[in-house]
Amino acid sequence: MAFDFDVIQRFYQRLAERVSAAREAVGRPLTYAEKVLYAHLWSSDRPRPFKRGDAYVNFGPDRVAMQDATAQMALLQFMQAGKSRVAVPATVHADHLIPAKNGAGLDLAAALDMNREVYAFLASASSAYGIGFWKPGAGIIHPVSYTHLTLPTKRIV
């Protein structure tokens, strides 16, 4: 993946601004976890001290990554919402419907045959709503997400 360094710089500048505002609102230094969480408050929430076990806090992700077995229902629900595009970058990874039985080549061929309709739906729906699609055999969701799609302190769901 080619990273857009302007986007990265803006993200980290915004991160620093949000952490600074949170530290001022809380009135003390923040732990690393608090910095990451305060930096991802939903846009309508303002930084303030949150009492553990008492407060309800809305967070926004930087990215959504879905695997093929659950993305089907998620995309159907998204389609029902009437939105034309996703609000944050999102990807579908076709990896969970590939059985590990006879070796990579045979397993991929079997999955392509068995799940052809599912993969066609995922690719089509992803394309229609601006969602990236990692086709079967393109990689396993976890290492792909961490090596190609995110950066330190970014929140991925």
Model segments located where?
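N-terminal amphipathic, basic-rich helices that act as targeting or association modules
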Residues: 2-88
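Conserved short loop/turn motifs at secondary-structure junctions
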Residues: 5-8, 106-112, 141
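Short, solvent-exposed polar/charged micro-motifs at secondary-structure junctions
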Residues: 68-70, 100-104, 142-146
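Glycine-rich, flexible beta-strand/loop modules in the N-terminal catalytic cores of phosphate-handling
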Residues: 76-130
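Acidic, glycine-enriched active-site microenvironments
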Residues: 125, 140-142
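Short secondary-structure capping/junction motifs at helix and strand boundaries
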Residues: 129-137
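Conserved small/polar residues in nucleotide/adenosyl-binding loops
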Residues: 147-153
